[in-house]
Amino acid sequence: LFSFESHFAHYSPGDFYKRHYDAFRGEANRVLSVVVYLNHAWQPTDGGELVLYLDDKDQEGVKVTPSFGTVVAFLSEEFPHEVLPAMRDRYSIAGWYRVNTSTADKVDPPR
């Protein structure tokens, strides 16, 4: 692994993120996705779960409640995922471990 990029994410009530991959096979340098949740006293009615799918055909997925201290890690190119609508403010730090995809001896820094 070459570097780590991250961002602080705030979802307001009603916000969601459609199903997607964090990297496309062979086209990006994100390798491992990591999410750390910062939400105290999260309740099932608060929504905002991360849903990880085994592949594009999986319609059920596995739901992860965004409770304080929960950490999720998954391969960026392998697992489609989404965030269901949040019913209250939802906070996390999302990040990606990257590999160096440099060419001609030039370093490929995080974007």
Predicted regions: what they are:
Residues 1-110:
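Catalytic core of non-heme Fe(II) oxygenases with the double-stranded beta-helix
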